[in-house]
């Protein structure tokens, strides 16, 4: 189970962890690290089954906690096909929201190439009419698909991660449709659900 947490409210993970409402949950570090649980995809590849993790961020977590009673799934390039299928079964109207990046220094928002492409990958697997915004995301994904890794490594946030030694994070996040996991927000935490809608 992954509990999204509003990152801008956390300045001391030790203090926040001691008062967290999720008994037994471990806090993932806000600073990207491959050696401990963090926002780095590499750090989560060996996470034990059944572990509870609190993941703080200023983009995806904030959006997740703002959806209220609306059924909410977490999608990306890795699980685009599975999430699209599950969303399509859940309702006729689907909103796909690229999270972007929230800057810690001034709280400003930066739209991200990789989030637009990820949204397009999910849209590519949906049927039905599309908004103009969805059409643009779909076109962007189709244009990028044949050179996905190269473009992800060369986009703004990709270059920043490469410079910091996290090129593997980019490549890992850029793997298309390699996961059937569908994370659904249930009682404040993302749990894996089957495409029939039942938690696993």
What kind of feature is each model-predicted range?
Residues 34-71, 112-200:
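Long, charged alpha-helical interface segments
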Residues 4-94, 101:
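Acidic/Gly/His-enriched mid-domain segments of enzyme catalytic cores or analogous surface patches
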Residues 101-115:
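Phosphate/ribose-phosphate-bearing ligand recognition and processing surfaces
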Residues 93-100, 134-140:
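Noncatalytic linker/hinge segments flanking ATPase motor cores
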Residues 3, 8-9, 153, 175:
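Active-/binding-site microenvironments in catalytic and ligand-binding cores
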Residues 1-2, 180:
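Residue-level detector of short coil/turn "hinge" positions at structural boundaries
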Residues 11-13, 105, 191-192:
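Short secondary-structure boundary/hinge segments and terminal tails
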């Amino acid at each position: 189970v992954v509990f999204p947490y509003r990152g801008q409210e956390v300045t001391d993970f030790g203090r926040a962890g001691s008062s967290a409402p999720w008994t037994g949950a471990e806090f993932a570090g806000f600073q990207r690290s491959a050696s401990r649980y963090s926002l780095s995809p590499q750090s989560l590849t060996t996470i034990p089954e059944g572990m509870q993790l609190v993941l703080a961020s200023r983009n995806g977590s904030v959006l997740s906690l703002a959806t209220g009673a609306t059924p909410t799934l977490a999608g990306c390039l890795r699980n685009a096909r599975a999430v699209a299928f599950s969303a399509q079964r859940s309702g006729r109207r689907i909103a796909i929201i690229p999270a972007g990046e929230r800057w810690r220094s001034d709280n400003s928002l930066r739209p991200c190439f990789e989030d637009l492409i990820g949204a397009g990958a999910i849209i590519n697997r949906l049927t039905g009419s599309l908004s103009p915004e969805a059409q643009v995301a779909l076109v962007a994904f189709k244009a990028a698909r044949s050179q996905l890794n190269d473009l992800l490594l060369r986009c703004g946030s990709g270059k920043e991660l490469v410079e910091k030694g996290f090129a593997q994070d980019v490549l890992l996040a850029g793997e298309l449709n390699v996961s059937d996991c569908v994370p659904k927000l249930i009682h404040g935490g993302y749990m894996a659900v089957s495409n029939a809608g039942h938690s696993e």
